[in-house]
Amino acid sequence: MCHFNELSIEIESKNLRSAKKIFHCPYEECGKKYSRPSLLEQHLRTHSNERPFVCDYTGCSKAFYRKSHLKIHKRCHTNVKPFSCHYDGCDAQFYTQQHLERHIEVHRKPKPYACTWEGCDECFSKHQQLRSHISACHTHLLPYPCTYQDCELRFATKQKLQNHVNRAHEKIISYSCPHESCVGHEGFEKWSQLQNHIREAHVPSCSICGRQFKTAAHLRHHVVLHQTTLEERKTYHCPMEGCKKSFTRSSALKKHISVIHEGNMAFHCDSCGTKFGYKHMLQRHLERGTCKKAHKPYINECGIKHDGIEGVAIHDQKEKELSSNLVSDVAKKIINEVTGHGYKEAREYSCSFPECNYRFKRLYDMHRHLNSHH
C-alpha cells in the first residue's frame, strides 16, 4: 500500500506540473509548452534565430539564445574552468558540467587497446585512438598530410587534418538566412555574419503600420498595440490608497510611485534649482526659457527683468522688429490657424497608425500620443 501511495503522489505531481504549462508555442508542428512566459520567449528564439545576448569581448561577436549560455561562453576568454575530473591521475578541467560528464564517460568505457611502448600505461577504447597516440607521443610521425596545393602541413589524426582543411582551405556554410524571400546569399560561415546580414537586409517591421524596429522582440511588443486597447494594456495598477492610476509597464508604475507618492525629484535645473521628477519636464522647462536664475536680474528701459545684459540687448532688438512686423505676424498666425498652412512643415513626427493624422514637433510628444490613444 505504501508503494502504491508513493506512486500515486508521483503521478499526481507530474500531472500538476504538466497542467501548469499553459503557454503554448504558436508555431505549427511544435508542441512545446511552458509554465512561464519568459520560458516561452526563450524557446521562440530557437524559431526566429534571434540571439540577443552577444559577447562583448574584443574580436568576439558570438551570440546566444540565453544569458546563461553567454556566461558560460565568457569562461573561454577568462580561461576559468570550474569543473574538474575527480579520477586519479587526471587533471582535466572543463567550462561546463556537461563537458565534464562527457569526459567521465571516457574513463568508464572499457579500454582493451593498451600501448605496448616501454614505460607507457595508456589504454584506449578504440584501436584508432591507440594508433594516433603512438604517432603523436612515441614515433612523432604525422601520417595525414594536407593534399591542397602548396600546403605542406601534416597531422597526427584524420580529425585534426579535417579541422585544418575546413578552417584554411574550404568555406563551410554553417548558417543560412531563414527568410524565404532572401536571394543572392549562399550562406555564412559565422553566426555573427548572419546576424549582421539580418540586421541590414531584413529589418523587423510592422505589417500593419510599417514601423521598423531594431530587434524582433521590440516588434513583438509593438504588435500588441494594434491587437489591444490602451485600457486593456494597463495591467499595472498603483497600489496606493485613493490612487486609480494604471500603466502598461511595470517600470512606469515604479516611476509613478517614486515621483508622485514618494516625492523623489531626480532632475534639477542647474540655473534656478527647480526640481523635477521626470527628465522630459526638465527639458520642457529649459526649452521654454522660463528658468529664473538666482543672480540679480538686469532691467531694461521697459522695466522688464532679464537674466543678463545680453538679454537686454536681445529684448531691445526684438522690440524694434516687433513694432514693424507685429501686424503682419499676427495676421499670418491667424491665417495659419484657420487654413492649417504650415502645420505639417512645423511638425516632423507623424503618427504611424493608419487614418491618424496627428503630427508633433517632438518625438516625445508622439510617443505620449501613441501610448494614450493607440
UniProtKB/Swiss-Prot annotation:
It comes from the Eukaryota. Disulfide bonds: none annotated. One of its GO terms (cellular component) is cytosol. PROSITE patterns: ZINC_FINGER_C2H2_1, ZINC_FINGER_C2H2_2. InterPro entries: Zinc_finger_trans_reg, Znf_C2H2_sf, Znf_C2H2_type. Keywords: DNA-binding, Metal-binding, Nucleus, Repeat, RNA-binding, Transcription, Transcription regulation, Zinc, Zinc-finger. One of its GO terms (biological process) is transcription initiation at RNA polymerase III promoter. It is found in: Nucleus. A zinc finger (C2H2-type) spans 23-47, 53-77, 83-107, 113-138, 144-169, 204-226, 236-261, 267-291, 349-374. One of its GO terms (molecular function) is 5S rRNA binding. Its main location: nucleus. Is required for correct transcription of 5S RNA genes by RNA polymerase III. Also binds the transcribed 5S RNA's. Initiates transcription of the 5S ribosomal RNA gene. This is Transcription factor IIIA. The lineage of its organism: Eukaryota, Fungi, Dikarya, Ascomycota, Taphrinomycotina. The gene is sfc2.
